[in-house]
């Protein structure tokens, strides 16, 4: 009976102690170790045994539960470790072995985390087996009560095995893997039994070893070591791939793309955080820091071949950029950065000493017997800071971020006003005609290159990155002159000019900026599209302002010619005086238009662009963190768009209509020689008054007064209404039932 009991404690049943589940099976059919676990103990004393007292029976049945738990825990450990493939390494053909492993993977869903937990369970079961062996030796050597000795020797396992069995039961039932498995163990560690807590913490430690190995691969080498999809960092295309796909298949897919494309894809959308696999005790902020650190290390360890080729060529530019940055960053810039710059320009983007430092920090976490959240957070933050600092060195110093930002400001934000003034003057006559779908872009290239020749210095190395684009049109686009002619009927009929929703075809003028690695990490397509949005707005504003000036100069020049001709011919010029007197109210309208456009332009260029540029420069000089720079730059662009009212539909639509009216007014004014009828000008003036006063009403509306944009709206309104003339005009017009075609003096 002693040996029956000892064997049962090790999971082997016999005649005295039986397994009810096995008895239900057909005789001679082997028991399948992969069958689902039983929810309750199936080890029982044989019912036909009558020589055992009821009290002893109860004690034996209590003891043999340990044998049941041992067997189930042992089966779980063997199944999870699944090392049977080792036996066939030398006896099976490699292709057949690969097929077999693939089949086993599909059937059993391998998990490195389960394997680690199984190793921890194996350690506990080893202690249990030693205890059973010690009991056997003691019973054979001494004459002691059997049941009392066994109970005393295995008493601590009554506390350990039932909770452990509940853990593996939950794991098997819900197919828990990866970070979810760590969650289960971490929650169960919070218990009041010291022995059980120590045991569960050991299992959690085994699971953390796998996580730390994955973190080391990711944060030291930029490699995602996750063959079974259990890490909380995943590839973006993992949703399209079966988690059972081998690492070789993923590598083969990535090999089809170039290193350059892969690097950009990995940075922008290649990886993401899987919330299902992120342990609850790791905050989302830390998960994002781990994600960023790994992506940054990938970038630093895998630079673009073109960038490596240009390394020696850009050495002098690098040092100049580094000195310029230090000059802006005050006198307390660390001296160690000088050595770092030398190392970066001379060789590695991520020095081996830094990689060793990261690896040492992760190794300290790995060797700790318990998981300390504070230590984990400090380590992750330190690694992230190292990665962000070296990425900052790469982008800001080596790739000259400030130079690119200045170039975008020069060309997309019209900082080089002389260039765009020259370009608009050279292309003025061309833009009076409809843009041709086939040659519109090439037509514009002539004045564009001519303006560049006149105004752009040879040392401007960034101009070569700027190119002019004229998108093809999907619909028929009318020119400005055609809009003016076809709108005559509606103007004569006093219809609303804005009912015609077609836009000037030349408003689609676009700039493109060529960005190389690694600046593509900073200047994404989304960022460049925001720059383009502001550029198209500013170039229209610049063109409108120029047309208002040119129309005045053109008509004045024509008037002087006529006056000189009349004096030469000895005529009294009464007809010319009458025409000049009749059109004088229109010049007041033109002045009002120029006043509004000029102040809008001054507000955007000075109050918005220049002020936000200074804020951005301060952030760049004070920060050495790449992610902070990205955030500051996003704030800069958002401020440009928001403070220019491009995201306020009511304001932007009215300003758009006002610019169209200004252009139509200018072309009508210049055509007065051939078409002396002023009714069209009067209708344009009337419509402009309406739009101008609507703009004032919106700027003063209570709806926008409480918004975040209220200070900028008030600043723009202050420029327009610095002497209360704008307000008085608006009130006067709004109180009149029928608007007048001309503004009062």
From Swiss-Prot:
CC terms in the record's Gene Ontology section: cytoplasm; microtubule; microtubule organizing center; plasmodesma; spindle; spindle pole; tubulin complex
Tell me where in or outside the cell this protein is found: Cytoplasm, Cytoskeleton, Microtubule organizing center; Cytoplasm, Cytoskeleton, Spindle
UniProt GO molecular function:
gamma-tubulin binding
> Does the keyword section mention Metal-binding?
no
The UniProt induction remark is: Up-regulated in galls upon nematode infection.
> InterPro entries of this UniProt entry?
Cro/C1-type_HTH, GCP, GCP_C, GCP_C_sf, GCP_N
Could you confirm whether the keyword Cytoplasm appears in this record? Answer: yes
| Key words of the record | Cytoplasm, Cytoskeleton, Microtubule
Primary localization class, coarse: cytoplasm
Main function: Gamma-tubulin complex is necessary for microtubule nucleation at the microtubule organizing centers (MTOCs). Gamma-tubulin complex is essential for the control of microtubular network remodeling in the course of initiation and development of giant-feeding cells, and for the successful reproduction of nematodes (e.g. Meloidogyne spp.) in their plant hosts.
- Of which family is this protein a member? Belongs to the TUBGCP family.
Q: Which PANTHER family match?
A: GAMMA TUBULIN COMPLEX PROTEIN, GAMMA-TUBULIN COMPLEX COMPONENT 4
Q: How does it assemble?
A: Gamma-tubulin complex is composed of gamma-tubulin and GCP proteins.
Q: What is this protein called?
A: Gamma-tubulin complex component 4
Q: Which organism is it from?
A: Arabidopsis thaliana (Mouse-ear cress)
- This protein's gene is called GCP4
């Amino acid at each position: 009976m002693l040996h029956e009991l000892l064997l049962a404690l090790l999971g082997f049943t016999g005649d005295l102690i039986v397994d009810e589940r096995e008895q239900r099976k057909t005789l001679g059919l082997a028991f399948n170790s992969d069958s689902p676990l039983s929810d309750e103990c199936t080890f029982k004393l044989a019912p036909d045994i009558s020589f055992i007292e009821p009290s002893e029976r109860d004690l034996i049945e209590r003891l043999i539960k340990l044998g049941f738990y041992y067997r189930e825990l042992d089966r779980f450990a063997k199944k999870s470790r699944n090392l049977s493939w080792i036996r066939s390494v030398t006896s099976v053909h490699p292709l057949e072995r690969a097929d077999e492993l693939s089949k086993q993977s599909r059937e059993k869903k391998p998990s490195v985390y389960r394997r680690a937990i199984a190793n921890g369970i194996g350690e506990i079961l080893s202690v249990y087996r030693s205890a059973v062996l010690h009991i056997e030796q003691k019973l054979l050597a001494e004459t002691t009560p059997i049941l009392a000795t066994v109970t005393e020797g295995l008493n601590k396992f009554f506390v350990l095995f039932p909770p452990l069995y509940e853990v593996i039961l939950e794991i098997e039932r819900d197919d828990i893997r990866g970070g979810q498995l760590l969650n289960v163990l971490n929650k169960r560690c919070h218990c009041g039994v010291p022995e059980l807590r120590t045991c569960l913490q050991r299992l959690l430690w085994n699971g953390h070893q796998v996580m730390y190995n994955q973190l080391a691969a990711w944060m030291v080498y930029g490699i995602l070591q996750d063959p079974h999809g259990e890490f909380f960092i995943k590839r973006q295309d993992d949703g399209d791939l079966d988690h059972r796909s081998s690492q070789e298949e993923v590598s083969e897919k990535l090999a089809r793309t170039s290193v350059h494309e892969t690097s950009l894809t990995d940075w922008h959308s290649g990886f993401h955080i899987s919330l299902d696999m992120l342990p609850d005790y790791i905050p989302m902020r830390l998960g994002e820091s781990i994600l960023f650190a790994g992506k940054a290390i990938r970038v630093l360890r895998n630079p673009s071949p073109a960038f490596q080729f240009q390394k020696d060529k850009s050495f002098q530019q690098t040092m100049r950029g580094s000195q310029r940055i230090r000059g802006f960053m005050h006198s307390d810039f660390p001296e160690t950065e000088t050595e770092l710059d030398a190392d970066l320009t001379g060789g590695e983007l991520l020095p081996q000493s830094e990689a060793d430092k990261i690896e040492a920090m992760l190794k300290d976490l790995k060797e700790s017997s318990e998981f300390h959240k504070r230590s984990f957070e400090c380590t992750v933050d330190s690694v992230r800071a190292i990665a962000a600092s070296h990425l900052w060195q790469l982008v800001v110093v080596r790739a000259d971020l400030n130079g690119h930002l200045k170039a975008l400001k020069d060309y997309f934000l019209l900082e080089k006003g002389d260039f765009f003034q020259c370009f608009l003057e050279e292309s003025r006559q061309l833009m009076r005609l409809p843009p041709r779908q086939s040659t519109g872009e090439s037509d514009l290239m002539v004045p564009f290159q001519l303006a560049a020749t006149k105004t752009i210095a040879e040392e401007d190395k960034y101009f070569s990155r700027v190119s002019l684009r004229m998108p093809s049109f999907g619909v028929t686009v009318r020119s400005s002159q055609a809009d003016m002619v076809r709108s005559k009927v509606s103007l004569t009929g006093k219809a609303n000019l804005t009912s015609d929703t077609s836009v000037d075809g030349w408003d689609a003028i676009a700039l493109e900026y060529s960005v190389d690695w690694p600046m593509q990490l900073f200047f994404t397509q989304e960022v460049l599209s925001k720059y383009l949005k502001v550029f198209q707005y500013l170039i229209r504003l610049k063109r409108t302002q120029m047309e208002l000036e040119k129309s005045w100069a053109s008509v004045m020049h024509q008037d002087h010619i006529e006056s000189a001709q009349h004096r030469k011919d000895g005529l009294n010029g009464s007809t010319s005086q009458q025409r000049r007197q009749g059109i004088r109210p229109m010049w007041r309208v033109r002045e009002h238009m120029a006043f509004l456009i000029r102040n809008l332009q001054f507000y955007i260029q000075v109050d918005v662009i220049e002020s936000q540029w200074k804020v951005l420069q301060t952030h760049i000089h004070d920060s050495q963190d790449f992610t902070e720079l990205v955030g500051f730059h996003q704030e800069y662009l958002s401020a440009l768009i928001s403070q220019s009212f491009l995201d306020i539909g009511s304001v932007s639509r009215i300003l758009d209509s006002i610019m169209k009216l200004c252009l139509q007014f200018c072309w009508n004014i210049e055509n007065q020689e051939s078409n002396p009828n002023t009714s069209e000008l009067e209708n344009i003036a009337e419509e402009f008054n309406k739009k101008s006063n609507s703009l004032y009403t919106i700027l003063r509306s209570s709806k926008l007064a409480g918004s975040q944009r209220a200070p900028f709206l008030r600043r723009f309104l202050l420029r327009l209404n610095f002497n209360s003339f704008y307000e008085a005009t608006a009130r006067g017009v709004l109180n009149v039932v029928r608007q007048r075609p001309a503004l009062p003096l």
